[in-house]
Regions:
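Non-catalytic DNA-recognition/assembly elements of restriction-modification systems
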Residues: 1-24, 196-220, 226-237
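Short, ligand-facing micro-motifs at secondary-structure edges
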Residues: 33-52, 69-93, 104-109, 117-123, ...
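A short glycine-rich beta-alpha junction/loop motif
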Residues: 6, 74, 89-95, 124-147, ...
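Short, solvent-exposed loop/turn positions at domain surfaces
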Residues: 57-58, 157, 164, 311
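Generic structural signal for buried aliphatic residues
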Residues: 64, 69-70, 156, 342
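Amphipathic alpha-helical coiled-coil/heptad-repeat segments
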Residues: 1-11, 143-204, 326-382
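Residue-level recognition of short, solvent-exposed, well-ordered loop/turn junctions
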Residues: 9, 52-53, 59, 64-66
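Short alpha-helix capping/helix-loop boundary micro-motifs
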Residues: 50-59, 242, 283
Length: 382
């Protein structure tokens, strides 16, 4: 333990908080509640992204009340936590926590700190690691007095509100971009004219295949685990995010398409030196505007993949799926207009995502200082 700050008290975790033992049995309880599973809680942010209903479940769940704190004990490294805004039930893999020596608003931030996460990850079970309360409950922490708990919780909740507003803005921008992209890139039924277009463009669009307009279609050569920490170049697998590696096999402007896995058909655009997994398709040397093609594939490639899967084909992309993909093209000038506009929207979204990460970093720094007593908030902080 660190030096005890003035006015703070050292307690074992079992004296700081308790785990609720209330259970919901769908075979006996008839009232319907919102049910939170681990997948409904966003990692690291405490944001709830949905729920199911207790009437639709068949297993015993934990009961929680508004104001109690939920903490995912399964794979605690995922950092899933939520301050309940309603009464409900949740997965048995989620602890329902209530403060004993602390108020719940403070407890919500207490469980997010690095020291708590460290002991939570001294877990039991190899394949399905779970936090071990019998071990954790005996670990001691320094706790501030009640009035300081309130000030700390208030300060951190303001950062959370800023973070949540930024996330909502990202979601709104992404919804807008998806909607306008679909209208700009989808032709009316039986016609070669899009649902929406910029002023000054009236010509019909022309259908071409990717093979017609892309001179270089190949895959990467590497295994998916070839990534290297702190590598110099991007390494694209079939995931949504890229990794790093110290060697490159491609240099230039390219579209990359995930060829299998959970994100089959996901489309990346990159300009520079990079490497790729052996099931990632790399498309280079286009005769049409590459950004227009990228955004067109974002909208329409998944639809083609789904049709082929419904015919019984295995859920991965073969080369002919790429080559035979039909794209409707306007004039090069209109392609550039559409691609440029959508890339500007993407740039706005990327800037907001960077802002989101900066806010998360600011929150981590504030938690470190406030929850250790390194920084103390004065009585009239609010």
């Amino acid at each position: 333990m660190n030096k005890l700050p003035d006015g703070w008290t050292e307690y074992k975790l079992k004296d700081i908080m308790s785990i609720s033992s209330k259970r919901y049995n769908p075979n006996k309880d008839t009232k319907n509640y919102k049910c939170i599973e681990l997948e409904h809680i966003e990692s690291e942010t405490g944001i709830l992204n949905g729920h199911t209903n207790s009437k639709d479940i068949h297993s015993v769940k934990n009961v929680f009340e508004k104001g109690e704190v939920l903490y995912g004990k399964l794979r605690p490294y995922l950092k899933k936590f939520y301050l309940a805004k309603f009464d409900g039930v949740c997965s048995s893999e989620i602890w329902v926590l209530k403060g004993k020596k602390v108020i719940n608003d403070f407890l919500y931030y207490f469980i997010q700190q690095d020291n708590f996460n460290y002991i939570a990850n001294v877990s039991i079970g190899m394949i399905m690691p779970r936090a071990d309360w019998s071990y954790m409950s005996e670990i001691s922490f320094n706790i501030p007095p009640l009035d300081e708990q309130k000030r700390i919780a208030s300060a951190l909740s303001k950062i959370d509100a800023y973070l949540e507003n930024t996330i909502k803005l990202i979601e709104e921008k992404e919804r807008f971009k998806r909607g306008i992209a679909k209208k700009l890139l989808t032709c009316k039924e039986g016609e070669n004219i899009p649902e929406a277009r910029f002023k000054g463009f009236e010509d019909e669009w022309e259908t071409k295949t990717l093979e017609n307009i892309c001179k270089n279609i190949k895959t990467g050569k590497l295994n998916a685990n070839a990534m290297e920490k702190d590598g110099l170049y991007r390494f694209y697998t079939c995931a949504k995010d890229y990794y790093k590696i110290n060697t490159y096999a491609f240099d230039g402007e390219a579209i990359l398409i995930s060829g299998n896995g959970a994100h089959v058909g996901y489309v990346h655009y990159y300009n520079g030196k990079f490497n790729a997994y052996q099931r990632t398709y790399v498309l280079m040397d286009f005769t049409e505007n590459i950004l227009f093609i990228k955004y067109y594939l974002d909208i329409h490639l998944k639809y083609k993949i789904n049709i082929e899967n419904n015919k019984g084909n295995i859920p991965y992309i073969v080369l002919n799926t790429i080559k035979d993909m039909e794209i409707k093209f306007p004039s090069l000038e209109e392609q550039e207009k559409i691609g440029g506009y959508l890339s500007l929207l993407d740039a706005e979204i990327d800037n907001l995502k960077k802002q989101k990460e900066l806010i998360k970093e600011m929150k981590r720094g504030a938690m470190q200082k406030l929850l250790s007593g390194e920084v103390r908030l004065v009585d009239n902080y609010d």
